[in-house]
Amino acid sequence: MTDNQEIKPKKLTLGNSKLSLNKSFDSLTGAQSFVNANSKTLVEVRKSSTGSATTLSLNKERNSLDQTVIDANKEEFNRRLSILKKAAEQSKLNDPSKISTLSKLASINQSANSRIEPLETDKEVEPKQQNTEENKVEVSAKIVQDDEDIPSQIPKKKEDIFVKSPLVGMRTRYGIESEKELDKTADRKIVAPKIKLEEPKKFKKADLFNMLSDDESGSGRTRSLASIKRAREKEKRKLVSQAPEKVYREVTIPEVIGVGDLANAMSERVADVIKELMKLGILANASQTIDADTAELVATNLGHTVKRVQESDVENVLISDDKVEDLRTRAPVVTVMGHVDHGKTSLLDALKSTDIAAGELGGITQHIGAYRVTLADGRAITFIDTPGHEAFSEMRSRGAKVTDIVIIVVAADDGIKTQTVEAINHAKAAGVPIIVAINKIDKPDIDIERVKNELYVHEIIGEEAGGDVMVIPISALKKINLDKLEEAILLIAEMQDLKANPFGAAAGVVIESKIEQGRGTLTTILVQRGTLRNSDIIIAGTSYGKVKKMINDKGLEILEATPSVPVEIQGLNEVPFAGDKFNVVQNEKQAKDIAEYRMRLAKEKKISIAPRSSLEDLFLKASGNSKIKELPLIIKGDVQGSVEAISGSLLKLPSDEIKLRILHSGVGPITESDLSLAHASSAIIVGFNVRAGANALTAAEKEKVDIRYYSIIYHLIDDIKAIMSGMLDPIVREQYIGSAEIRQIFNIIKVGKIAGSYVTKGIIKKRAGVRLLRDNVVIHEGKFKTLKRFKDEVKEVREGYECGIAFENYEDIREGDTVEVFELIQEQRQL
């Protein structure tokens, strides 16, 4: 039966007639219900409350007694009871309280069975018995007493199984709190009290294990916790004995590798690697590094194969080949070069129709600028403006290397100058085509032919003279012949067939870099191949980082940059050097490895070229008698190119007696750390287009550190040159002022020998230097002890007068000796 089917209990009365069940009980259904309960269902007795008993006459009770009770016999009851026991055994409950529940249920049924016999005999009793009421009360009380013995420690389950008692209409249920229906009669109802439930007992670890194991094995044997532990340990030993076979790998070993990294590469334990090292006589821990040869021996001893790589192989990821079908036409990159104030920036100003030159101090370009100009027909030209001052030779050289065409601007009224010649040499060394733009043709009294003749001297021959160089007279101010200049650029670009691969990872060159407060490191780059996008990770020299923002030459933020497009990017961890190559890499770890490798190379190179001091120099420096003086400097600038140009120009200043030592150079404002370094080393801080913050100024006043600001580079160089000149020892020069002839020697007691002399030329001064000559040979050089005219001590004696002379610490004088008098004059030296 199911839980949803409700069975109306029949009224139970006592009489002389035989008891019988009016509803048959299916033993198969009851057994199936208990089997479905499985091992996790429990037995509980459920009974429903009844109303109060009514009193009826004995004759009515006998007539209403159900005939089915009489037909029930003891064999049927026992058979069904055995079914209950079998179901309880199949439930595999290990809780003793549950077993006692079943036993008590059986005892209840036996007590009910014992009541069957008197009921059968009562059928023959006379219907007019007067003690019927008392008998019914006794039987009911006994039933209630038996019901109270039924335990309630039965946990709830979702699966319910019902069994109806064949005698008293009771319903037994697994999985839900127990309730029993007893003794419903037509005249009276006996209420059975509800059974008190106790808290369900918690299953222990062993109980759960036994339930699971019994389900699998089918046996009801209870296992102890100790046996469970032994079984688990046995399984563990079995797993250890079945260890997987060792895998031998191909291990990539660089020039230097850590012990822990080597163990990870081989998938070996660090302890095993350390043991192998100890066999080789090397004591090392997991954090120490070993060389490639030792690592190879360890890996070979452990059965692995080795692949040796060089440290420089980290840069192999930067090498890529472009397919011919991927190449696309790109815009030409044009570098404008020339002497100072010849109109390079004004030319770009005219081409861009913007006022670039107005914002430059002294009319001098201080750093490289990159611009992109779009012509009327839609074609574009990228211009790179380089400084013309001699200090920016390195920047001009870099500009020539990254360009396709060089425009050399020459002023028609000034002709060829020093930086013009240098620009020509840079262009020739780079092997790029040259266009000469003769600027300022709008000025009066100019001679273009004179400029062309000067170009011939430097092997720049125009097309009209049979050469291959295009010479175009222009006026940047009046915008004369600018269209011809643009046509010449596009013609040469078309002849060169300039192409680049816009697909794949981007690569290019750093044009300029700087640090800006609030924005961090800003780097101007020129994309030469591929497409640079936001969030790309790039490596430039020893700097690396993720591209956070890209801004074009018009100040607009863009998402990608194609070949020949100059952009300013933000996101590098430090300022790269102008001219460094940049590449896009896959991840930040790859970029970091390349940067660390390049930093090691730079450090080794710096150590190798450092000047070595001799032991004598060290002793002289320690004693303070060193002939070489030092001028320590700290240079801070707005852009990396300017700082590099300043450092290079200052180091070229010629001086054998003064060593210019640049302690630190960098991009950005002057900080307190710069002040601390300057104070510790007595250095001068040079700021080019940067200033010191409020805290740095306070520290400078307190520590009395010299800070000098400049905005034009040649003012800075002249000032440092003057400082170095002031540190040089002055030149001491002798100046002849007079001479005298010794005519007579006097010996005076307590004074010594006195030379009576006659001043023959010039003037004789007491504090001047003196030489004594005999036969035109200097026999003494010193000072006067006394100089008298008659008896008076005088400071000087002029030509034509007589005087008395005595020498300091020298008396070997004779008549006829000559006295020469001179002064020592100091002159300031210049670099």
UniProtKB/Swiss-Prot annotation:
Kindly give the SUPFAM superfamilies that the UniProt entry links to this protein: Initiation factor IF2/eIF5b, domain 3, P-loop containing nucleoside triphosphate hydrolases, Translation proteins
**Entry keyword Nucleotide-binding:** yes
Which UniProt key words apply to this protein? Cytoplasm, GTP-binding, Initiation factor, Nucleotide-binding, Protein biosynthesis
Fetch the InterPro entries from UniProt: EF-G-like_DII, EFTu-like_2, IF2_II, IF2_N, P-loop_NTPase, Small_GTP-bd, T_Tr_GTP-bd_dom, TF_IF2_bacterial-like
Which residues lie within the region annotated G5? 475-477
Q: Where in the cell is it found?
A: Cytoplasm
The highest taxon in the source lineage is Bacteria
What GO molecular-function term can you cite, just one? GTP binding
Q: Could you tell me which residue ranges the tr-type G domain spans?
A: 329-499
Q: Where is this region: G2?
A: 363-367
Q: What is its main location?
A: cytoplasm
Q: Where is this region: G3?
A: 385-388
- Outline the segment boundaries, as ranges, of region: G4: 439-442
- Annotated region (G1) at 338-345
Does this UniProt record's set of keywords contain Oxidoreductase? no
Any one Gene Ontology cellular component term annotated for this protein: cytoplasm
Please tell me where GTP binds in this chain. Answer: 338-345, 385-389, 439-442
What job does the chain carry out?
One of the essential components for the initiation of protein synthesis. Protects formylmethionyl-tRNA from spontaneous hydrolysis and promotes its binding to the 30S ribosomal subunits. Also involved in the hydrolysis of GTP during the formation of the 70S ribosomal complex.
Output the HAMAP family linked to this UniProt entry: IF_2_B
Membership in a protein family? Belongs to the TRAFAC class translation factor GTPase superfamily. Classic translation factor GTPase family. IF-2 subfamily.
PANTHER family attached here? TR-TYPE G DOMAIN-CONTAINING PROTEIN, TRANSLATION INITIATION FACTOR IF-2-RELATED
Could you tell me what this protein is called? Translation initiation factor IF-2
Q: Which organism is it from?
A: Rickettsia massiliae (strain Mtu5)
Q: Provide the organism lineage as a comma list.
A: Bacteria, Pseudomonadati, Pseudomonadota, Alphaproteobacteria, Rickettsiales
